[in-house]
Amino acid sequence: LGLAALTRREARGTLLRHIMISFTNISGAEEIGANCYLLEMDGTRIVLDSGMHPKKEGKAAMPDFDSLEPNSVEAVFLSHSHLDHLGTLPVLQEKQPAAEVFMTPAAAALSEVMLHNSVNVMSAKRLDLGIVEYPFFTHNDLDRLSDAWHAKSCNEVFRVGFRQNVLATFYDAGHILGSAGVMLEGESGHTVFYTGDVQFEDQSMIPGADFPESGVDTLVMECTRGGFQRSAHYSRPEEMVRFGKAIEETLERGGAVLI
């Protein structure tokens, strides 16, 4: 997406506000990968997610952290604990030690497990594939850095930034346990809502997203399958039956099933 600068004047009551927002994709763009975005609003620099590309190895799997000035990021928001949104968070923290990191309590618990497992996987790849950059961080690094995470519940309003000038609120995204979109409101009153990955339908164990239905000035939304029309005959129960049959057929012919 590159750098998108939005400047506008708008009347709120009797006050005339000047709004400056910039949004920069530092994740590689145009594919599912190392999700990471820089949002600058009212002078506050915020990073949304810090993922690792699932199909690349070594430094090529990381976002472009070199585009961030050292120690310039004030807050980091994690939408959920899948590695394409989480996998390089400790690297970002080392490069941006002044940044506070925010996520939901469930995301914090899952992220710790996911990242410790990632250390094991990267260490094995270093030995098996000779990828000398791995691991990006160690178990000890993770234990130290995770102490700086702040767990915030959905619908809890809190302030972020060096000047505490941005209001933040998580909303349940329905994607996985602990997933959340985040509403950010600058001192100008302009709001930005970042969805992260979202699922609006109820799943077997996770209810669908509970997002705000108003009050959003700028929306940043995932659209992984946004270009595809869902069949008019689609239903979740029927898809579950199809999925079960596919598993059964695979096992009957001696195949393996990884979920």
Regions found by a protein language model. Name each.
Residues 3-19:
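Short, Lys/Arg-enriched N-terminal segments with co-localized hydrophobic residues
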